[in-house]
């Protein structure tokens, strides 16, 4: 789908240049040029002959329902699973239509997390995940389950015994392991009850999520000092994967992490994976979240893909939470602490264009690395659904996804 025009003539208005990433970074063309590219691509998408594209293409934004499906565009490049994070509130209406058209896989954004499924010990609520399973069934989609064990959305009771925080005593370790097993077993039993023939749409699972800290902290592999770690140490990851394999033997088991384009974090991440494999822990896939920013170095994402392949060519790989932020924090590569930031560009059109050019680099890399990637998942169906607009993050200027707040095709889409 890539059809980006050559540099416009001087008479074409150009956008403010992006902050320099390095000397090799290509100069950014003007916004008018990107709009021209969108017009030409629109004409192609709706079947207008190339020679008449400029005359026939509409001047207004093109609805996402009228353009080529991303699952076909990236599928033609060799990506089998083209996914989207979605919530149970999106199973009907225009969001459902857009998702069904463009994606062949989906990730539950929150419905698979422990606080949604087991908010109180022994009381399970599968209503949200069931809606998503039904949606996947109805539209022939696969589910990438996310995520049984992640501290920020694991309820507090998981780590307490009669109000007392669990320690690393043998008794407390046994209690936490028992709770981990009860949780995984309940999910597996519920899925099995819905799919007694074993034909569940769940093809993969993020077993653990974000276990590596952003800098040295003295723990093995700089693992985060969470209650999971304080009670079980590094072995909590072993326990999680062994339980997942026991109860979901046919599902591909992934470990998921953010900021994997950082060389130091890459070293910690792959060091942990290497040790897990040496202990014969059933890690089958390695994911890069890829919440990136305007100055992120796409080559560092590629370097991590190559490093995983060098570690073990049998490991599956996924880009699991793709979006492109345009805040000052995102521009410095910090994908976790984005609160109280400001936009890089004050003009929304400039933001959209800059994000589009990052996606162009991303899609080029994804095509080149398609043989190493099992899955690419966008973290939201459109810009009205992005986590970056949530009250806890509060960055309304961000336009991180291929489709806009009205589900129109954005420059990020045309870059595909």
What are these regions (language model features)?
Residues 86-102, 129, 180-190, 264-276, ...:
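Short, acidic/polar
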Residues 58-105, 109:
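Boundary/entry segment of secreted carbohydrate-active catalytic domains
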Residues 259-284, 304, 331, 384-387:
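Substrate-binding cleft/loops of secretory-pathway carbohydrate-active enzymes
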Residues 71, 101-119, 127-254, 258-260, ...:
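Substrate-binding cleft and catalytic face of glycoside hydrolase catalytic domains
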Residues 84-96, 114-127, 212-216, 220, ...:
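Acidic-and-aromatic substrate-binding clefts and catalytic sites of carbohydrate-active enzymes
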Residues 61-69, 118, 161-162, 190-194, ...:
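Aromatic-rich peripheral "rim/lid" segments of glycoside hydrolase catalytic domains that contact
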Residues 2-56:
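Secretory targeting and sorting signals
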Residues 158-177, 263-277, 389-401:
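Short, electropositive alpha-helical surface patch
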